[in-house]
UniProtKB/Swiss-Prot annotation:
The name this protein goes by in its record: Major fimbrium subunit FimA type Ib
Keywords assigned by UniProt, alphabetized: Cell adhesion, Cell outer membrane, Fimbrium, Lipoprotein, Membrane, Palmitate, Signal, Virulence
Compartment list: Fimbrium; Cell outer membrane
Region (Important for oligomerization and fimbrium assembly): 374-383
Entries under InterPro entries matching the protein: FimA_C, FimA_N, Fimbrillin
Amino acid sequence: MKKTKFFLLGLAALAMTACNKDNEAEPVTEGNATISVVLKTSNSNRAFGVGDDESKVAKLTVMVYNGEQQEAIKSAENATKVEDIKCSAGQRTLVVMANTGAMELVGKTLAEVKALTTELTAENQEAAGLIMTAEPKTIVLKAGKNYIGYSGTGEGNHIENDPLKIKRVHARMAFTEIKVQMSAAYDNIYTFVPEKIYGLIAKKQSNLFGATLVNADANYLTGSLTTFNGAYTPANYANVPWLSRDYIAPTADAPQGFYVLENDYSANSGTIHPTILCVYGKLQKNGADLTGTDLAAAQAANWVDGQGKTYYPVLVNFNSNNYTYDNGYTPKNKIERNHKYDIKLTITGPGTNNPENPITESAHLNVQCTVAEWVLVGQNATW
């Protein structure tokens, strides 16, 4: 009998422990207030995968902080609003995130949430799960129901009528046009046969919050298997196959490129590592692959590598006389979150065998860029 009692007590203790753990999944303060939040995402644009995926909110999470302490957290799947989050009246900090995947947010302090980072992934390249954040927001909750993003009429405390804006952490860089118009010196002699589009010197890691998301992590990613050792080449550099695409002629409706993270290369001195979008392929002479003395001469001119392949790199959002920008936009020498960098490339001569070296102002390339919000940047490049 005693054994049976102890056994039953043990089961009860285990059950209580399990219940406690379930309750901790989303800590809620039983207070005198609730808050409901409606979200506004940036406009959708055609992606490399499914267009709507760029703005898809697969999971929306709202957190309420009392100082550093997480007072409440609630999530909704495939929704742009989270309602009736139980909390307490008073000054609070609101944190909103979307598409956080398996990221563990329950119980994190405000400082810990602000310090969160993300890494560039293969899944991002099909616009899947583009993480979004809004900067932490100070609000004052009143006893009863509180609302953000709802009509200002009706019951409760309407903190703001406009939906809360949330932005993608990623940016998009893409060719929307590549055309070959050889100048008189090369016309009817040289042609370019494109084979690949590469993303080069892409930041591996990004912060999720802050005026800039660029952090001190020194790791970069490339789609090319070639080691260039150029002036821009970072020391910590890894190849990933998903920053490489087989060439398909880009159009405005079917851009060709990659999603990337913030990168700042605006320093006036010292080493910079600019993010590059690059088209790669064969340089041909009189319709044939380069061989013999023609290949040797092109190599000596730093036009091609040993296989007669050439690169046409475009430094994204970069200030250069070879680049023009739409709508009077001033290039910032950086990749910024939630920006879409659309690039039109005109090739007027041979390229380079080292896309991670500075290009000369007389390079055979013209670039035209557009930026929008998504902030669109239109960039035009001529090689």
